[in-house]
Curated annotation (Swiss-Prot):
Cytochrome c oxidase is the component of the respiratory chain that catalyzes the reduction of oxygen to water. Subunits 1-3 form the functional core of the enzyme complex. CO I is the catalytic subunit of the enzyme. Electrons originating in cytochrome c are transferred via the copper A center of subunit 2 and heme A of subunit 1 to the bimetallic center formed by heme A3 and copper B. Cu cation binds at H265, Y269, H314, H315. This is Cytochrome c oxidase subunit 1. There is a cross-link at H265-Y269 (1'-histidyl-3'-tyrosine (His-Tyr)). It is found in: Cell membrane. Gene3D superfamilies: Cytochrome c oxidase-like, subunit I domain.
Amino acid sequence: MTAVAPRVDGHVAPQRPEPTGHARKGSKAWLMMTTTDHKQLGIMYIIMSFSFFFLGGLMALLIRAELFTPGLQFLSNEQFNQLFTMHGTVMLLLYGTPIVWGFANYVLPLQIGAPDVAFPRLNAFGFWITTVGGVAMLAGFLTPGGAADFGWTMYSPLSDSIHSPGIGSDMWIIGVGATGIGSVASAINMLTTILCLRAPGMTMFRMPVFTWNIFVTSVLALLIFPLLLAAALGVLYDRKLGGHIYDPANGGSILWQHLFWFFGHPEVYVLALPFFGIISEIIPVFSRKPMFGYIGLVFATLSIGALSMAVWAHHMFVTGAVLLPFFSFMTFLISVPTGVKFFNWVGTMWKGHITWETPMIWAVGFMSTFLFGGLTGIMLASPPLDFHLSDSYFLIAHFHYTLFGTVVFASCAGVYFWFPKMTGRMMDERLGKIHFWLTFVGFHGTFMVQHWLGNMGMPRRYADYLDSDGFTTLNQISTIFSFLLGLSVIPFVWNVFKSWRYGELVTVDDPWGYGNSLEWATSCPPPRHNFTSLPRIRSERPAFELHYPHMIERMRREAHVGEHDLRAETTQSPTPAEVR
């Protein structure tokens, strides 16, 4: 890897891009608060998300410390309840979801050749309302009764005013609604940008895989976040006005579970699909090959999006109120398109010239971790096994293998991959690999043993256990490795700060040398409206064709460009140079 990629066409490497137009005046803080630039907002989303991630991780360390040994009890039961409630909320709604929009904001307009997103002010509104919602939820810790303590799933009757009377619970519900509004705003923006602002020649089946994944994610977000907002307002109505919507006497507890999980399981794919897209961008670059099975990968993404709306009730097997065969079958079925994605990723790496830069290491770490989480998910799709393992630490381990394995590993891969594009500087490879191995070892040491804890019968959300239960040794192993996992953020944060200021300067469009999509056809960082000129888009690899024009004919001979692109080539109007 070099920050100055080799060129074969006599091209002179450009210097850092000069600012275009007049610089805006005012303090940096004011400019940040009033910006509508999608690139700045994307970076702000990513910084905000990782800030909440660090807070959520601190809560997790307190939870693990409490469980180190029986009878420790340095936290009260009430404090423990508040911590696991806020930990789950922060990680899902304040880290996992906003960082999706962070990468989408920065990368997606570049990948489709757009000068900005469709609605810049709506974009800024989505960011700030999400941030305010997150602060409101966390401010519950400062109220007399403390933060929300009914679990991040907000099950009734735990969430009613009798069992959770504090104002912190009300602030949590309002914060959830605010983050939902922010996600809807971002989803509208991304959909409109993709449908209306693609560059000439950028057909739907020439879009990068990451853009396709954001497209499907945005559709899912528009379907589920309004439901979450309406359902959460119903809880607030019950608490403040005595609505009895979720009163257990009226079947309200089961109603809430249906409403919540109809949001909750597609939300898992809102968190997963964009990061599948990030991995699909990274693997071809460091395998030195085009994506194997591009069309199949796109249709696998569409299939996952469709099937994700039909599996919510597998979270409710133990209620006895759902049709077990249907939801079990649909859960097994959704693993098929996910398996197709793995087949395509492995096929892309197969016989490629793989180089192990930091983004590629994180991508392979994602694949191994998520694969294990997916296999345990197949186990839980079987109702008899689910009856035994439900609400145990086996479920906690599965959930973290799928979501931590997806969101954290792939978001770190994305940061290392696109950091040169965002800042014009390279990150430190040695620190990046230290960060990876601390995270990989710490994560697997923390959560692997929790499968056995769950199978032995340890329930989730318990603040203590008996020495005679036999859980002590495995809990101590899990806690020790959790602190190793916590330490992994230190080299990451230092790497970001150091590289932002002192990293190796990038003077070419594509510092990795083999980028495929359009973001690698503009400077690092890009100018205000992204491009000073656009290359001709003749396939799903326009940047690669720009940098390696002598490879175009060979790629067509080897069928690395689909038939739809060849047909489009024959029907395109000739350029002025071709006419002359």
